Curated annotation (Swiss-Prot):
Residue ranges of the TM segments: 10-30
The gene coding this protein: HSD1
Designated name of the protein: 11-beta-hydroxysteroid dehydrogenase 1A
Molecular function via GO: cortisol dehydrogenase (NAD+) activity; estradiol 17-beta-dehydrogenase [NAD(P)+] activity
Main location: other
Length: 349
């Protein structure tokens, strides 16, 4: 057994390199033809039933509007009931023929089953499940005194998607439907102070890649790995290490830094286009894909860059981080951040 592994240790890199040289050109030519075909024969969403979790703000809200513009029937769910009703009303005005709202918390298994049951009771079918609900927690790991308070991050970001997917899967099989899994580029581009958020998104990525193999062609899965998008995080809204909801745009500047923030509406349009074309992955903005190559080829460089941009000296305030100092340069914030996330009037509910 050891002899076989020793042989593979020597030969696998060599054969992989030359194998890729011959395999990649025809493979990407096939992918190119496939993309043309899928664009021409993109799915018509009119009358399709779409369930979106976390639909009260950010990408989830914009996904509701994008699906509505294409004539889909919507089941929208979130914890903030009043805000959810506002989104539903706008979706109706944009063209959705039927919208139902479900006030629920995806971190609770019973709520996830109820979300799906209410959708099926109302519409009788389910075509797309969009697992979008999520939350962000920002804190250095060593500063978290009670680790159990971080459980909510994984309960919402990871288990919420798992619970809802399990409940919806029989109906998605019947309709040969689609699942949208909202992971993040944070699954590989791991910024400090967000250890549990990063872990939840990495778990989500791995889980749905496994599900894709298990389900085969019965249910198509699109995994979304957005970069920095208009959202509550880029507005400066997050949970502390002790589970307290905080609005702090200075910390936002530290965590987002000099990375341009893309619009949530543009991101939603790219996601829906990708789902209708049966794309396996959607990354928005698309240039974030190159960060994965850097992670694979030069992981030490990524770690060094993160320490340089995000971290501070021992005992020093986060405001001294290089990210924050760059953002404090006049004109930088207005150039890189859309006006919607620069306003000081951010809701704290």
């Amino acid at each position: 057994m050891e002899l076989i592994n020793d042989f593979l240790n020597l030969t696998a890199p060599f054969f992989t390199f030359f194998g890729l040289c011959f395999f990649l050109p025809p493979f990407y030519f096939f992918k190119f033809l496939q993309s043309i075909f899928s664009t021409i024969f993109s799915e018509n969403l009119y009358g399709k039933v779409v369930l979106i979790t976390g639909a009260s703000s950010g990408i989830g809200e914009q996904l509701a509007y994008e699906y509505a513009c294409r004539g889909a029937c919507l089941a929208l769910t979130a914890r903030r009931k009043n805000r959810l009703e506002e989104v539903a009303e706008i979706a109706r005005e944009l063209g959705s023929p039927n919208v139902v709202t479900v006030h629920a918390d995806v971190s609770k298994p019973d709520d996830c089953r109820r979300i799906v049951d209410d959708t099926i009771t109302h519409f009788g079918r389910l075509d797309h499940l969009v697992n979008n609900a999520g939350m962000t927690q920002i804190s250095m790991f060593e500063n978290i005194e009670d680790i159990t308070r971080t459980k909510a991050v994984l309960d919402t970001n990871f288990w919420g998607s798992v619970y809802t997917t399990r409940a919806a899967l029989p109906y998605l099989r019947q309709s040969n439907g689609k699942i949208v899994a909202m992971s993040s580029s944070a699954a590989w581009l791991t910024a400090p102070r967000m250890s549990f958020y990063n872990a939840s998104k990495a778990a989500l990525l791995s889980f749905f890649e496994t599900m894709r193999i298990e389900l085969g062609g019965d249910v198509h899965i699109t995994i979304v790995t957005p970069g920095y998008i208009e959202s509550e995080l880029t507005q400066g809204k997050y949970f502390s290490g002790e589970g307290e909801l905080i609005v702090n745009q200075d910390m936002r500047d530290v965590q987002v830094g000099p990375f341009p923030v893309a619009s949530a509406s543009g991101c939603a349009k790219s996601i829906v286009n990708g789902v209708c074309r049966k794309q396996r992955y959607v990354t928005e903005p698309s240039w974030f894909k190159v960060t994965y190559l850097w992670k694979v080829l030069c992981p030490e460089l990524i770690e060094w860059g993160c320490r340089l941009l995000y971290m501070t000296g021992t005992g020093m305030s986060e405001d001294t981080a290089l990210n924050k100092r760059i953002m404090d340069i006049p004109g930088v914030r207005s150039t890189l951040y859309p006006e919607s996330i620069r306003t000081p009037e951010i809701k704290s509910d």
